[in-house]
């Protein structure tokens, strides 16, 4: 699930808005091709469907929670990529780009489980301090 959770948006950006749904469908074909049984495929599909932080879906397993948290946590280690997205790909000005990245990180932090928020609080605060 961790490897496949963003596959739809990576292979076709037009699928981004519903990439959690399309990705789960794509994962079925990939995993079936590699001989995974249907039970494991369904578990992976649920992780992919429920990883999307901007779509507030209940996490029904520890695996779903882990994939969703890891997806959000990854943003704190990819600030340069987020800045590139804002300034180069989206063509934003200095302040707008900075606010875009800060808002993305704030949303990501709010999506974390309670345990992950406690663990990543300091890192989140340090990254936000640099951006301020």
Locate predicted features.
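Short helix-to-loop capping/linker segments positioned immediately adjacent to catalytic or ligand/cofactor-binding
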Residues: 31-38, 54-58
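An amphipathic alpha-helix signature
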Residues: 20-28, 45, 98, 102
């Amino acid at each position: 699930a961790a490897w496949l959770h963003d596959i739809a948006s990576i292979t076709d950006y037009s699928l981004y808005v519903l990439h959690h749904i399309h990705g789960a469908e794509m994962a079925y074909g990939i995993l079936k091709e590699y001989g995974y049984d249907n039970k494991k495929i369904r578990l992976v599909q649920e992780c992919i469907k429920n990883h999307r932080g901007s779509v507030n879906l209940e996490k029904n397993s520890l695996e779903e929670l882990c994939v969703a948290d890891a997806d959000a946590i990854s943003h704190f280690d990819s600030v340069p990529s987020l800045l590139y997205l804002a300034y180069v790909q989206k063509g934003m000005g200095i302040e707008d780009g900075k606010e875009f990245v800060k808002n993305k990180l704030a949303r990501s932090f709010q999506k974390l489980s309670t345990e992950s928020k406690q663990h990543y609080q300091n890192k989140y605060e340090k990254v936000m301090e640099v951006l301020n």
